[in-house]
Curated annotation (Swiss-Prot):
Recorded name of the encoding gene: yxaC
Protein name, entry field: Uncharacterized protein YxaC
Disulphide-bonded residues: none
Subcellular compartments: Cell membrane
Membership in a protein family: Belongs to the YohK (E.coli)/YwbG (IPA-22R) (B.subtilis) family.
Organism: Bacillus subtilis (strain 168)
Record carries keyword Plastid: no
Topology within the bilayer: Multi-pass membrane protein
Pfam families (alphabetical): LrgB (PF04172)
């Protein structure tokens, strides 16, 4: 009974924090005030301040986490509605995803080499632009550290969501197709949530890109390691 009450309180506080950050973002729509980022910082700060362990938070957090699956499945609806566009533009979509995936991996390697990062961490940073569950499996298969891969995936997601819109504006990419592919390829699920601001077509393209990156990344990860003799 006590754990049930704790779980309910944690769920309510988490949802309340997120809604408050959404309201803040609507009032001040700045790139670094995106609700996912500010809510994460707020929750981490609260856990540290009140000395609450990760396991303690996950008593309620696991129920919120369980909604991730249905949320991903729900992305099938905009895909269905935009299917004719996806079929029509399948070649540029696939080309954009391949370029985004390869650049994501190669940029990670360049960053790692520039800062002299250890070999294990280098392999962990490789799948940073792929959605977390798949990135963990790729990193483990390559000999990386899965826990560090999660950190790099989060960094890629947040940096893409914050800087992505600025680059899209700077490069004058106004096509929902291009915006969705860019956000989904670079920032996986977080990029897809950001694509909501660009419309239904952008969300569809972002979810397609995220899925294709996960599938193709399983093949290209080992290939990049082999090509660059890592």
């Amino acid at each position: 009974m006590q754990q049930a009450c704790i779980a309910i309180i944690i769920i309510l506080l988490t949802v309340a924090a997120y809604l408050a950050m959404v309201k803040l973002y609507k009032r001040f729509p700045l790139p670094f005030l995106i609700p996912v980022l500010t809510t994460t910082i707020l929750i981490v700060a609260a856990l540290m301040m009140f000395h609450v362990s990760y396991e303690g938070y996950m008593i309620g957090g696991k129920w919120i986490n369980s909604l991730l699956g249905p949320a991903v499945v729900a992305l099938a609806y905009p895909l269905y509605k935009q299917w004719h566009i996806i079929v029509k533009h399948c070649v540029p979509i696939l080309g954009g995803v391949l370029v985004g995936l390869c650049m994501g991996m190669i940029s990670g390697l360049i960053f790692a080499e520039a800062f002299g990062i250890d070999h294990d961490l280098l392999l962990s940073i490789l799948p940073k632009s792929i959605t977390t569950p798949v990135a963990i499996q790729i990193a483990a298969g390559l000999g990386g550290v899965p826990s560090m891969t999660v950190v790099f995936v989060m960094i890629a997601g947040f940096s893409g969501v914050i800087l992505g819109p600025l680059f899209l504006k700077w490069l004058r990419i106004r096509s929902s197709l291009g915006q969705g592919i860019a956000l989904g390829s670079a920032s996986h699920a977080l990029g897809t949530s950001k694509a909501l601001e660009y419309g239904e077509l952008a969300v569809s393209m972002s979810s397609v890109s995220m899925t294709l990156c996960a599938v193709l990344g399983s093949f290209f990860g080992p290939l990049v390691v082999w090509l660059f003799h890592i």
